């Protein structure tokens, strides 16, 4: 949020950031807040969400090093969405990772970086594999996602393209010792 106020060469740098560059990058939360501060059409909760969206629930974030309940709820929500977007987006310095990898990162960092119940809500309602998207199954077949289930976002219903068979990956995951899973999106 508000990273566009930072120097373009910093945003597009292909390699790792120096300590000074990282320090500059971390100012975007404050820059965004300063830009919104005087706007009466934007709620104070939204402004504080922008300011605090890099705070981690364990206190290791920035700009203030807040923890737990010191962080506005909206900031905790923005933080999850921002990290998900960062992981799944192509950047000059890294390739995009799959939604599954992003969800796994969020789940592995619930309670450290993220409020656990917000991570749970996010992965419950955000489909990891969008309907209509072709995916590669663990058996090497390509399938299309035909349905997402609210509480099984990592295991949608798919239709295998080779034979048209519809497979409920959530059901398979619960009932088979070696269930099919999705390895990646078809590129």
Task: For each feature predicted by the language model, list its residue ranges.
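Histidine- and acidic-residue-rich, metal-dependent catalytic cores
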Residues: 3-187
